[in-house]
From Swiss-Prot:
BURP domain location: 407-621
Tissue: Expressed in flowers and stems.
Organism name: Arabidopsis thaliana (Mouse-ear cress)
Keywords, comma-separated and alphabetical: Apoplast, Cell wall, Glycoprotein, Repeat, Secreted, Signal
FXXY repeat residue numbers: 118-121, 126-129, 140-143, 154-157, 168-171, 182-185, 196-199, 210-213, 224-227, 239-242, 253-256, 267-270, 281-284, 295-298, 309-312, 323-326, 337-340, 351-354, 365-368, 374-377, 384-387
Identification of the protein by name: Polygalacturonase 1 beta-like protein 1
Main location: secreted
Annotated glycosylation sites: N125, N278, N371, N388, N461
Disruption phenotype: No visible phenotype. Atpgl1, atpgl2 and atpgl3 triple mutants produce smaller leaves and petioles.
Localization: Secreted, Extracellular space, Apoplast; Secreted, Cell wall
Pfam families: BURP
Gene expressing this chain: PGL1
Role of this protein: Involved in cell size determination.
Record remark: domains: The BURP domain located at the C-terminus has not been identified in non-plant proteins.
């Protein structure tokens, strides 16, 4: 026993010997006696000390991203991963490992027949609400606001109801990664209304699916007002079989997707076989950046419908709309396009099979653009007026969708300069790295998307499926000219990539906080890393994925700076920022946001940007 004890003592002392924190190496462990030295965090400490030169300061920032799993939990989940059994324990795994996962919302047979008011609610499954409900109203106010990874499911809601009203006000505002499902909502309902107001405003990565919504409804009105206003980058909304077989149902989309960034809408079999439908799209996609809208079999085989597109995609930047089999085989349908597609920079509109096989239809195009394509459409009953041969902005560079301060010139990094700070706040869900012992056993390739979906309970066409697919494809994208890249799901993998590019004498830096975001700040003391010389570095940016995943890459010919950021009035230090300047932009695209903002072209100027919250930069140690 004495020999065993003598053997273990120096081994354990090595486990406790050094920990990284606050830029220094701490002896005597750095752990409290209660912390197990076999945890993933302790393992990361040892790996850093093994791989990084002993004179390089440690990084409490990187250590904070380490897995919170206990030693026992880490070993348990690693074993489950090797046996492909993690899906059976996913909720436990997500909770213990601090992952980003959607809850599994299963259907329920519980019924709710009375009026309901939901205020300040979150993450619910609504099944059989308002079924066969005469009159009354349900109100959702300030529901799922300021949430993270919000998912709500509405199934068989207001089905067969009469005169029942539903109000969604301030729903899922300012939330991050939102998925809402409306299935068989208002089906076969008579009268009443559904009102969506200030719905998903300011949301990051919104997804809403309306399936069989108001199907076979009679005189039921739906209003979408200020829907996904100022939302950012997501699949947007999908309307499938919306109002199909409906009778006299007015639908209004007002201020829908206004000032949003890269948001899509998909209308499939919308109003099909409907009678006397009245749909109005007013101020739809206005001031948006690259909106994508797809209308497929919209109003097909309908009777006496009226569709109005007013100020649709007005003042938007680029964007694309596709109308396929729109109003096909319909009867006496009236469609009016007014100020359609008056984008600042031209997008494209495709009308295929438009009004084909229809009788007695009247379709007016007033003020539409040069990039409109009309293919296989009806030759009668269609009127074209004021065809715009040039876009509103004449194709000029527009910087309204590039946030002020997001890119700047190197000359701005001088003490005393006033500079606009962009919003550097991290918009991603909070997650942790997985230990290498687990992440190495998980599938991660486009050929194994089905396996990844199984692990993380991602259904077909779900938000999680899109998140997984987008991340994997971006990671497998070939590097750009002179770029070296790798996606990493563990801190150990990040250390390996950084040291493979820069060597083992490296320093990891990040911007200290988000203080000064979206405000003017004053540049304080500036320090050029590596003497301010042109050098190489590794930058790592978060990707949206269930576990913490970073896209790390290195490009040649950069300068890296650290600078104090001061309050312009008091001159007090409020932040310490890290900036990287790309000295060679010749391989960048001409439509890159930097050139829109700074007014130049690839290869003619250098471009600088800040390292945002929770992103990081590795550089060779001075």
């Amino acid at each position: 026993m004495r020999k065993q004890f003598v053997f273990l003592l120096p081994f354990l002392s090595r486990l406790y010997h050094v920990v990284i924190a606050g830029g220094e190496r701490l002896t005597n462990g750095g752990f409290s006696p209660e912390i197990n030295p076999f945890t993933p965090k302790a393992s990361l400490v040892r790996y850093w000390n093994k791989q990084i030169h002993h004179q390089s300061p440690g990084s409490a920032f990187l250590l904070s991203k380490a897995s919170p799993l206990t030693a026992v939990a880490s070993a348990t989940f690693a074993k489950l991963a090797s046996e492909n059994a993690l899906p059976d324990r996913l909720p436990d795994f997500c909770s213990a490992a601090n992952l980003f996962c959607f809850p599994d919302l299963g259907p329920t047979l519980e019924k709710h027949s009375n009026d309901v008011k939901f205020s300040v609610y979150d993450q619910r499954n609504f099944t059989n609400y308002g079924t066969i409900h005469p009159g009354g109203a349900d109100s959702f106010k300030k529901y799922s606001q300021n949430g993270n990874a919000v998912t709500d499911s509405f199934r068989r809601y207001s089905r067969d109801a009469a005169g029942h009203e539903d109000k969604f006000t301030g729903y899922a505002d300012n939330s991050n990664v939102v998925e809402e499902k409306f299935n068989s909502y208002g089906t076969s309902a008579t009268g009443g209304s559904g009102d969506f107001k200030n719905y998903q405003s300011g949301v990051n990565n919104p997804t809403t699916r309306f399936k069989a919504y108001s199907d076979e409804g009679n005189g039921r009105a739906q209003t979408f007002k200020t829907y996904t206003h100022e939302a950012n980058s997501g699949p947007g909304q999908s309307f499938t079989s919306y109002g199909k077989n409906g009778n006299g149902a007015p639908n209004e989309f007002s201020s829908y997707g206004v000032s949003s960034n890269v948001i899509g809408s998909d209308f499939s079999n919308y109003g099909e076989n409907g009678n006397a439908a009245n749909d109005t799209f007013k101020g739809y996609g206005g001031d948006g950046n690259v909106p994508q809208n797809n209308f497929k079999s919209y109003g097909a085989s309908g009777n006496a419908a009226v569709d109005t597109f007013l100020n649709y995609r007005d003042n938007a930047n680029v964007g694309d709309d596709s109308f396929s089999s729109y109003a096909k085989n319909s009867n006496f349908e009236k469609v009016d396009f007014v100020n359609y597609g008056k984008s600042i920079n031209p997008g494209s509109e495709s009308f295929s099979g438009y009004g084909k096989g229809a009788e007695g239809n009247k379709i007016d195009f007033k003020t539409y653009t040069q990039n409109s394509t009309f293919k296989d459409y009806t030759k009668t009953g269609v009127e074209f007026a004021k065809y715009n041969r040039s876009s509103l902005g004449g194709g000029k560079t527009v910087n309204k969708w590039v946030e002020p301060g997001k890119f700047f010139r190197e000359s701005m990094l001088k003490e005393g300069t006033l500079i606009w700070m962009p919003d550097i706040k991290d918009k991603m869900p909070k997650r942790s790295f997985l230990p290498r012992s687990i992440v190495s056993k998980l599938p991660f390739s486009t050929s194994k998307i089905a396996e990844i979906k199984r692990v993380f309970h991602a259904n077909d066409n779900s938000t999680m499926e899109g998140i997984i697919t987008d991340a994997v494809r971006e990671c497998e994208r070939p590097p750009t000219v002179s770029e070296t890249k790798r996606c990493v799901g563990s801190a150990e993998d990040m250390i390996d990539f950084a040291t493979s590019v820069l060597g083992r004498s490296v320093v990891l830096r990040t911007t200290e906080s988000v203080a000064g975001s979206k405000e003017k700040v004053m540049i304080g003391k500036v320090n050029g890393i590596n003497g301010g010389r042109v050098t190489k570095s590794v930058s790592c940016h978060q990707s949206l994925y269930p576990y913490l995943l970073y896209y790390c890459h290195s490009v040649p010919k950069v300068r890296v700076y650290e600078s104090d950021l001061l309050d312009p009035k008091s001159k007090a230090k409020i932040n310490h920022g890290i900036a990287i300047c790309h000295m060679d932009t010749s391989a960048w695209g001409a439509n890159h946001g930097a050139f829109m903002l700074l007014g130049s072209r690839p290869g003619q100027i250098e471009v600088c940007h800040w390292i945002f919250e929770n992103d990081m930069n590795w550089a060779i140690a001075d």
